[in-house]
């Protein structure tokens, strides 16, 4: 993961947003397998649980196994075929999501060697808002930022 580019700016921005809105007393369910940002959250005092690589499009049981007070999905919803069902199965009342916004000139990203490293959705901001609204979530804070990959 991140062999060629490490997303320092995105991680710093995401951590600042997390620290602004979430206490380190909370337990976070971070959607996806343990990753570099999971480690950053832990290094900053957060208790982090992760899913274990199951196909969340067809099986959301991982969201029921452990108790958590915050659900995070950082740069992962674009990989799911069915983020609607995942959002319906979240078992807490705090949610933090980040997504790469769709650029009008870019095709969906697709790795030819890793089936988990593919984008099914390329969201526009209104589409994420609609998805959250349809699944009963209320947006209370948001930030948009750029993440230049080559810098």
Each model region followed by its residue ranges:
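Flexible loop residues that form catalytic
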Residues: 76, 100, 145-147
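Short, glycine-/aromatic-enriched active-site segment of Class I SAM-dependent methyltransferases
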Residues: 97-121
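Glycine/Thr-rich phosphate-binding loops of Rossmann-like dinucleotide-binding domains
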Residues: 38, 81, 105
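Conserved N-terminal segment of class I S-adenosyl-L-methionine
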Residues: 1-70, 84-89, 113-130, 141-151
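Active-site flanking residues adjacent to catalytic metal/cofactor-binding acidic residues
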Residues: 29, 74, 97
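A short, conserved alpha-helix within the catalytic core of class I
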Residues: 80-92, 99
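A short beta-strand submotif of the Rossmann-like class I SAM-dependent methyltransferase core
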Residues: 70-76
């Amino acid at each position: 993961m991140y062999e060629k580019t490490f997303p320092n700016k995105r991680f710093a921005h995401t951590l600042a947003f997390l620290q602004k809105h979430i206490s380190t007393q909370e337990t976070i369910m971070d959607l996806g397998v343990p990753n570099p940002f999971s480690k950053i959250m832990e290094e900053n005092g957060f208790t982090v649980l992760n899913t274990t690589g199951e196909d969340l499009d067809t099986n959301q049981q991982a969201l029921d196994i452990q108790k958590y007070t915050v659900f995070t999905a950082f740069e992962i919803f674009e990989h799911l075929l069915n983020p609607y069902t995942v959002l319906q199965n979240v078992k807490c009342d705090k949610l933090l999501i980040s997504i790469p916004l769709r650029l009008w000139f870019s095709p969906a990203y697709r790795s030819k060697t890793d089936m988990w490293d593919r984008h099914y959705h390329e969201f526009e901001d209104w589409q994420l808002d609609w998805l959250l609204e349809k699944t009963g979530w209320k947006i209370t804070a948001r930030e948009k930022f750029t993440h230049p990959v080559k810098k």
